[in-house]
Amino acid sequence: MDLNAILIILGVIALIILVAHGIWSNRCEKSQYFENSKNFTREARIREPQENQQYQTADQSQSDFQRNLLETDNDCFSSESAHNSHQPLYHYSEQSAVQSVDQIKIRLPDSEPNYVMQERFSPKHTDYASMSIEELEKSIDLDEGINSSSQHLRQELAQISGQSIADDKVNIEEHMFTESTISFVEPQTNTESQQVVEKTKSGNSSFIMLYVVASENQGFSGLQLTKTLDELGFIFGKKQIYHRHVDLSITSPVLFSVANIEQPGTFDLTNIADFYTVGIALFMQSPSYGNATANLRMMIRAAKTIAQDLDGVVVTEQQEIFDEQAERDYLARVS
């Protein structure tokens, strides 16, 4: 017998041995698995369904809570949606920065199309953005937020007021805010919105401002700022600034807005990676759509959250620290 035949025979024998060993190993593993399954204690079998039941209960509770929120939102805005369903939609991006650190001039033209914006929202933590005004007013904790009455923050404000804010104020007044306008037009069939616009036309409206400024020699990164605004339910819109709507619907009224305090007051999303600003301004019209007190509380909560996330300071219209007394004074203006 030649060498080739011997090698072929040895190869076949080796292959048969490998196949037999694989089959034997597979059977051993299956046998061990079934032996282990028989050793499970009765306690372990009982614990698993109990844990599953707890998870199911928690999931069911969360599902019920979300369902209640959706039903509340639908009840609140179903009538408005029905009225507006026959009207054409005008796509818009709202805002041409309305703010300065001390003086901000805002005019309200008689007519302009309703703003419609593309929704950009990434919820995180508690979903305040999707809650209705009534739910938010009940659930909001007025004591939460930044401890803005601390001595450390007061020292930061004193430094900021003497440098960054003063410089930005001059630039804003000279180049931008004397020319900026923002309009809010009521839905034609919405009685409450009509009353707001009628007061605006009669000259009885005003704007309530809050500022969030960065620490000395620092600034807010565009990526971090836009991420925080998106998480709070703001939508980038007309005039290249952000707006907070009633229910994140592109047809719902605007409650308050956010703009850059640096000229020209806008947010350049095309170069957001290189965008920096020393601060932002939050402003709302008074009277506003719905409950003005609830809207103002929501704006204050948003300002505190932004300051906390970006290591900034909340400042009043008079460039003073926004403490508990200042918050009471602000709420008194709409009560």
Curated annotation (Swiss-Prot):
Pfam families: ZipA_C. Residues 26-335 are cytoplasmic. SMART domains: ZipA_C (SM00771). Residues 1-4 are periplasmic. It is found in: Cell inner membrane. It is a single-pass type I membrane protein. InterPro entries: Cell_div_ZipA, ZipA_FtsZ-bd_C, ZipA_FtsZ-bd_C_sf. It comes from the Bacteria. The chain crosses the membrane at residues 5-25. One of its GO terms (cellular component) is plasma membrane. Essential cell division protein that stabilizes the FtsZ protofilaments by cross-linking them and that serves as a cytoplasmic membrane anchor for the Z ring. Also required for the recruitment to the septal ring of downstream cell division proteins. Belongs to the ZipA family. NCBIfam families: septum_zipA (TIGR02205). Interacts with FtsZ via their C-terminal domains. This is Cell division protein ZipA. It comes from Histophilus somni (strain 129Pt). The lineage of its organism: Bacteria, Pseudomonadati, Pseudomonadota, Gammaproteobacteria, Pasteurellales.
